[in-house]
């Protein structure tokens, strides 16, 4: 018989652990030995912070993968925004979950793995966005010469906003609206993009005036400090802005992707203010110079016109010379008019004298006598004409009265009454037929209802089974042993209890 001493058993000196004990021991060992580590790797599976503010992703290289988590408090302290594929150095501690035997790193600090990694990522992003046309010079907008309102996207505290406001006040005082944002850290990019989009959505006639030009500004810093302005959402927001944008991020030697998307790049925030507004003193001097030039030009113009008018006046003849010929013509016309009036008056006098001789008193008296005779004849004919007219109208009225005899009306009334009596008889007959038809239909439906009801089935010797709730039992599978049932026959109900295994022979099979 073979010995089983080679198998671990109760007599072995190896300690025995439960699953939870060995998991807890591993957790303590890992956390004690790796309580503070620095891990270099590439960010994988990053989807941004969770709704809770925590971020879950993994660090990987070409041979392994390590799960990672950044709690909300540590996430807010990051100086840059993590991105998929970025190589970073994470500082934190390893921990395990005994319930699943998995381990991960809880990151307390994280930074890009050198400027080289960031520059490689920046160059890749630059090439990709340029291929989309976001840096196309044809999209650049001209800055307004004299804006009314300037929008500034920057930190509300610090020297940048003070320099911009001070420079604008010195050059050309106007209204400045500041949209406060964080200019460093994980939330820098989203906040700047939100500010640019927010300014673009302001209505022209709203309580907050829409800016005519935007300045996105930040002081100098390292590549990591300025990384938020390389964010893709910032570049897209600036490229899509309908308001001209001046980028003033970092010093003159610094550059970010927002510089390529903006309509104008300023070396410093102060330079951006100088680009945005002109110098008021220069405008006043230019206006004064142009006003003086205009006044001088107008003086020369009027002098030239005055000299031209004088030369023209000297070339013109005198008033007596101009009016001599018209005056002569007027005198000749007046002389001819006097003679013509005298001749015309003589002709009219001769004409009127001829008519006056025809209007003698005897002629007028004869005309009046003729008119009186005509009036008398008309007065004699008028009574006869009136009598004839009245006689004619009386005859017409008598004829119409004879036509309005009551006999036709009485005949029409009797005919209408007869028609109404016939309609009454037909109505009564139709109602009786309809009532009989409804009665017959009701009797047919009643017979059909009795035929289809289950009472007619009971009359033929069948029965209906109901359960304890009074519902019909349609299948045997719905009945369990010892169920209380009710069987309804033609003449009443009988209570029964279901029994398992009891089978009644089918009487039809023996026939």
Swiss-Prot record:
Molecular-function GO terms, alphabetical: exodeoxyribonuclease VII activity; nucleic acid binding
Reaction catalysis annotation: Exonucleolytic cleavage in either 5'- to 3'- or 3'- to 5'-direction to yield nucleoside 5'-phosphates
CDD domains: ExoVII_LU_OBF
Keyword tags: Cytoplasm, Exonuclease, Hydrolase, Nuclease
Cell location: Cytoplasm
Assigned EC number: 3.1.11.6
UniProt similarity note: Belongs to the XseA family.
Subunit composition and interactions: Heterooligomer composed of large and small subunits.
General function of this protein: Bidirectionally degrades single-stranded DNA into large acid-insoluble oligonucleotides, which are then degraded further into small acid-soluble oligonucleotides.
Protein name: Exodeoxyribonuclease 7 large subunit
The organism of origin for this protein: Brucella ovis (strain ATCC 25840 / 63/290 / NCTC 10512)
Gene of this entry: xseA
């Amino acid at each position: 018989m073979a010995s089983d001493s080679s198998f671990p058993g109760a007599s072995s000196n190896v300690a025995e652990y439960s699953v939870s004990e060995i998991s807890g021991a591993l957790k303590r060992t890992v956390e004690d030995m790796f309580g503070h580590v620095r891990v270099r790797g590439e960010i994988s599976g990053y989807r941004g912070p969770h709704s809770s503010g925590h971020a879950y992703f993994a660090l990987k290289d070409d041979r392994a993968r390590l799960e990672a988590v950044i709690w909300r408090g540590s996430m807010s302290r990051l100086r840059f925004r993590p991105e998929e594929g970025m190589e970073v150095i994470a500082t934190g501690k390893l921990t395990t979950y005994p319930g699943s035997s998995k381990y991960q790193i809880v990151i307390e600090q994280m930074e890009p793995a050198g400027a080289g990694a960031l520059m490689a990522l920046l160059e890749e992003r630059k090439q990709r966005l340029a291929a989309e046309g976001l840096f196309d010079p044809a999209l650049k907008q001209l800055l307004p010469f004299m804006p009314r309102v300037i929008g500034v996207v920057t930190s509300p505290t610090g020297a940048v906003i003070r320099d911009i406001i001070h420079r604008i006040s010195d050059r050309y005082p106007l209204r400045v609206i500041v949209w406060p944002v964080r200019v460093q850290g994980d939330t820098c990019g989203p906040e700047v993009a939100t500010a640019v989009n927010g300014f673009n959505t302001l209505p022209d006639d709203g309580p907050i005036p829409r800016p005519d030009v935007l300045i996105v500004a930040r002081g100098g810093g390292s590549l990591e400090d300025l990384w938020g302005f390389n964010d893709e959402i910032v570049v897209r927001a600036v490229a899509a802005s309908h308001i001209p944008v001046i980028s003033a991020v970092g010093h003159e030697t610094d550059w970010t992707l927002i510089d390529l998307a903006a309509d104008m790049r300023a070396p410093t925030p102060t330079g951006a203010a100088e680009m945005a507004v002109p110098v008021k003193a220069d405008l006043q001097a230019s206006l004064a110079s142009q006003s003086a030039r205009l006044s001088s030009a107008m003086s020369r113009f009027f002098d030239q016109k005055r000299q031209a008018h004088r030369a023209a006046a000297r070339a013109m003849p005198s008033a007596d010379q101009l009016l001599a010929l018209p005056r002569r013509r007027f005198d000749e016309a007046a002389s001819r008019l006097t003679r013509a009036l005298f001749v015309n008056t003589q002709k009219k006098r001769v004409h009127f004298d001829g008519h006056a001789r025809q209007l003698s008193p005897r002629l007028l008296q004869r005309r009046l006598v003729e008119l009186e005779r005509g009036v008398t004849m008309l007065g004699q004919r008028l009574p006869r004409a009136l009598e004839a007219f009245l006689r004619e109208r009386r005859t017409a009225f008598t004829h119409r009265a004879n036509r309005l005899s009551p006999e036709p009306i009485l005949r029409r009334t009797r005919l209408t009454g007869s028609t109404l009596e016939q309609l009454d008889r037909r109505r009564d007959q139709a109602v009786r037929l309809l009532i009989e038809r409804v009665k017959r239909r009701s009797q047919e439906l009643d017979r059909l209802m009795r035929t289809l009801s289950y009472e007619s089935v009971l009359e033929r010797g069948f029965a209906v089974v109901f359960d304890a709730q009074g519902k019909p039992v349609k299948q045997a599978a719905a009945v369990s042993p010892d169920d209380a049932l009710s069987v309804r026959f033609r003449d009443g109900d009988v209570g029964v209890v279901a029994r398992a295994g009891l089978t009644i022979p089918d009487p039809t099979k023996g026939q």
